[in-house]
A protein has these predicted regions:
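Broad structural signal for hydrophobic residues in well-ordered alpha-helices, predominantly aliphatic
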Residues: 15, 108, 173-174
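ATP-dependent adenylate-handling ligase core
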Residues: 1-14, 47
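Residue-level marker of alpha-helix boundaries and capping positions
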Residues: 3, 63-64, 161, 181
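Catalytic subdomain that performs nucleotidyl-dependent activation
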Residues: 8, 18-27, 31-126, 134, ...
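AMP-forming adenylation/ATP pyrophosphatase catalytic core
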Residues: 42, 55-58, 102, 120-211
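A generic alpha-helix signature
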Residues: 3-7, 99, 161-165
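Amphipathic alpha-helical segments that form well-ordered structural scaffolds
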Residues: 11, 76, 169-173
Length: 211
């Protein structure tokens, strides 16, 4: 399964646009959410990455099967004699997702039979939190004064933001500037720069210096 916003979806979206189709439907299901949470935890991801899979995106991707688990979908297909195609790579344990699916989660279910439900609820709760942060970030963007001619932002405006909101603002600005991924350590250094003026500067992507 591809991640939301994955480049793998671009050819499908382009094909849909050429044929004036309203959306592209993918086969993501409830198990994909649980697997995704475990994978992100193993990678040390933060709340945004743990927030699960959206039922629909602004790009035109819809995921109508998210309410159901894979066994439920397969049972329905068999009952209605509808054939389906299995991706042969789904059995390859060389992929992290497959190790989570075939090894990690089955072992977790031995101790916690409802682990899938717990993981999905966690993802849903974090998604709700992220939606709230997104709304607050939009409001903050309205009162944070514009970039100065030298590319700066008034320090007092950034100091007024709580850290969780400021982190998201910094990451959004980095993405807008084409800086790319900002690590957790870099984010912490940026907070210290804003709050304590120490360090005096932080370098991102080897060429962007914030001070």
């Amino acid at each position: 399964a591809t991640r939301p916003g994955s480049p793998a979806h671009l050819p499908l979206l382009e094909l849909a646009a050429r044929h004036s189709l309203a959306a592209v439907a993918t086969a993501h299901h409830r198990d994909d959410i649980a697997e995704g949470v475990v994978m992100q935890l193993l990678r040390g991801a933060g709340p945004r990455a743990l927030a699960g899979i959206a039922a629909a995106t602004s790009a035109g991707i819809v995921r109508p099967l998210l309410p159901w688990r894979r066994p439920e979908i397969v049972a329905w297909l068999r009952a209605n004699r509808i054939p389906w195609i299995e991706d042969s790579s789904n059995a390859d344990l060389g992929h992290l997702r497959n190790r989570v699916r075939h090894v990690v989660l089955p072992e977790l279910r031995r101790s916690a039979p409802r682990i899938d439900d717990h993981l999905v609820r966690l993802a849903d709760a974090l998604a709700a939190d992220e939606a709230l942060f997104a709304a607050e970030l939009e409001q903050a963007a309205a009162w944070i004064r514009p970039w100065a001619p030298d590319g700066g932002v008034p320090l007092a405006d950034l100091q007024a933001l709580a850290r969780p909101l400021r982190s998201r603002w910094l990451h959004a600005q980095a993405a807008r500037a084409g800086i790319g991924r900002v690590t957790r350590r870099q984010t912490e250094l940026l907070h210290r720069l804003i709050e304590e003026l120490a360090p005096r500067s932080v370098t991102l992507a080897g060429r962007w210096r914030l001070r």
